[in-house]
Amino acid sequence: MSSPVNNALTVDVEDWYHVCGIGGQTVPPRHSWRVEANVGKILALLERCRCRATFFMLGSVAESNPELAPMISAKGHEIASHGYSHTLLSRMDPQQFRDELLRTERILIEQTGQRPVGYRAPQWSVSPLTPWVDEVLAEHGYLYDSSRSPLPFVGDASGPRHPFRIATAHGVLWEIPPMVTPTRLVNLPSAGGWGFRLFPLAMVRATIERYQREESPAVLYLHPREVDPDGPRLRLSPLKRFAAYGTRADAAPRISALLERFRFTPLREMVAAWPSVS
């Protein structure tokens, strides 16, 4: 990898009501949807900072908002796949996963003219319970996955912090984990979500600088609802409410400060500069 190392800002394009692991939820009426306006805020922030990002599009959101993916792509950002229904992969079988992957792919190709080469599972839900994911992704020409988080509870706390290659019957796939802050006891979720909003910005900066010294990209992630502090909320258990909405400050100023300090590039371009996955 070159020095200074490029980092990546990734956006999981879903709406305020897309929360994993809750049943019986219906899609709210269209007038309450916020994703288009919030993505617009993120695009404006990126334009001000002259930065390009990777947007993991939820297929159902792209289908219901057909102007969204073309608008993002027209700004020079990468369009990748976040699946279709925002269902944990542990609740799918291989065929259901394949069907969702291809359904989202067809939608994004029709809307943007480009086939996605990257994938991220809802809530980092690639795990030993889903050993078939890598094979399906590689079979359908995906170059990278960003679904394994080196964290407890939502990933594998002992998993690698840096990108690594996975051999499959259909070729090699890059796995690109999100940034975490290592401590003596546990890795901390400093790259996005509640951790990014809660921990001191100085700690996040120091972690990015550590990744730079290790010659590895720091991968940050953002949800559109995180630039909408006054947006609607679901009624959730205390733990899920904290994870989804806790410390509900506007993440945009923090993201802006990091974009102005460090180099960022879309994951697709980052992977293209690495050793061949063929």
Enumerate the predicted regions with their spans.
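Metal-dependent polysaccharide deacetylase catalytic core of the NodB/CE4 family, i.e.
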Residues: 49-130, 142, 147-154, 171, ...
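Generic enzyme active-site microenvironment
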Residues: 10-13, 80, 120, 221
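Non-membrane alpha-helical structural segments and their capping/turn regions in soluble enzymes
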Residues: 32, 36, 94-102, 201, ...
